[in-house]
Design a protein with these regions (language model features):
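Conserved PLP cofactor-binding pocket of PLP-dependent enzymes
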Residues: 15-23, 307-311, 315, 332-352
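Conserved PLP-binding catalytic core of the aspartate aminotransferase-like
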Residues: 288, 300-332, 348
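PLP-dependent aminotransferase-like
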Residues: 105-160
Length: 377
């Protein structure tokens, strides 16, 4: 196939100058052990498929009609789950769309937005797309976030919590502190992985999610996703929680781009997922248990493992040659994520898989270690 030649003469200067986000690799090979994009190793609640099937079997004719523009049933279910008013809940076509609307709704060109320098790589893309100045605040040596480093004028702060790709958790006390010190700016807490987080020993926090703060702090907006803990990455459903004024701003912006972001099937499936709390709690705990066992096994192999509150772990091989390890694993059909960036290029981000996937990974790493030892003997 000949190489596609791109003619940019009809492009806007914005399109010409963008540096788009690069999605995680989605290879399609048999017997692949895919541990690179933080998908849930377990299927969604069976009730999701049942709800979607019911729509197709009983309401297929209604697919000619537009879906509910505000996803009323889903928002009501989420409001009940978090003990909120429905006007404090927003839903969109994946949390990536929700985050894009956040940048468009709250961050100003006149004042910068602050974010950690090592975090979700979509944030700089949003900033560039919407013409917002993004100042990236360096993480501490141990990859933690120092709230005092954010004491500067800004139109907002966005922090992934747990952070990605480190998996570290910022306390609710620190989030409340940021909100208090920046009372005229929106503090966005991106909680894509929060359902895998646990209250740390010695913490004064009774909970881990900043949703618990939004009634006290009117400038905190929390985003979440159905992609990770609810195993619905293929359905594309995200949400935001905040005071009614923040949610109204998102709704106005949403209706200026796409008034119907969630189709009928996505709304039905996502609502069923929210209502099946038993399955949700069970699978989240399974991932946490698998994360703990994988952490122990990698530590035994002399890998430095950061304390993770997500469905992935961030690890450093003893010799720091993460790129070589990733390449060697790929040759055996095991895909993990390596970031060729300063400060983290010696680390790998590894999704927590099923017990079988984790065992396959550990066995491959053990074999690599034995081969390396044989070469040096």
């Amino acid at each position: 196939m000949s190489e596609l030649k791109i003619d940019t003469r009809l492009w806007s200067s914005k399109a010409r100058n963008l540096s788009p986000y690069v999605p995680g690799e989605q290879p399609q090979h048999d017997n692949l052990c895919k541990l690179n994009t933080n998908e849930n190793p377990f299927p969604p609640s069976p009730k999701v498929g049942e709800a979607i099937t019911k729509v197709l079997e009983q309401q297929a004719d209604d697919l000619r009609l537009y879906p509910a523009p505000e996803s009323d049933d889903l928002r009501a279910a989420l409001a009940q789950l978090y003990d909120l008013d429905v006007n404090q809940v927003f839903v969109g076509n994946g949390s990536d769309e929700v985050l894009a609307l956040v940048f468009a709704s709250f961050f100003l060109k006149e004042r910068p937005v602050l974010a950690p320098d090592i975090s979700y790589s979509f944030y700089p893309v949003y900033a560039q797309t919407f013409g917002v100045d993004l100042i990236q605040i360096p993480l501490e040596e141990d990859f933690s976030i120092d709230p005092d480093a954010y004491r500067q004028p800004c139109s907002g702060i966005i922090i992934a919590n747990p952070n990605a790709p480190t998996g570290l958790l910022l306390s609710l006390a620190d989030i409340r502190k940021l909100a208090g010190e920046h009372s005229n700016s929106v503090i966005v807490i991106d909680e894509a992985y929060i359902d895998f987080a646990q209250v740390e020993a010695g913490s004064a926090d009774a909970q881990v999610s900043a949703v618990s703060l939004i009634n006290d702090c009117d400038n905190i907006l929390v985003t979440q996703t159905f992609s990770k803990s609810r195993s619905l990455a293929g359905l594309r459903v995200g949400m935001a929680f905040g005071n009614a004024s923040l949610i109204e701003a998102l709704t106005r912006m949403k209706n200026s781009f796409n008034s119907y972001p969630l189709d009928k099937l996505a709304q039905a499936g996502a609502t069923a997922s929210v209502l099946d709390t038993a399955y949700f709690e069970q699978t989240c705990q399974q991932v946490i248990d698998l994360r703990q066992s994988l952490t122990a096994e990698l530590t035994a192999l002399d890998y430095q493992v950061l304390p993770s509150h997500a469905n992935f772990i961030f690890v450093r091989p003893k010799d720091g040659n993460a790129s070589a390890v990733a390449s060697a694993l790929r040759e055996q059909g095991i895909i993990v994520r390596h970031f060729d960036k300063p400060r983290i290029n010696e680390y790998l981000r590894i999704t927590v898989g099923t017990a079988a996937q984790n065992n396959r990974l550990i066995e491959a790493l053990q074999a690599l270690q034995k081969n390396a030892e044989a070469v040096t003997d």
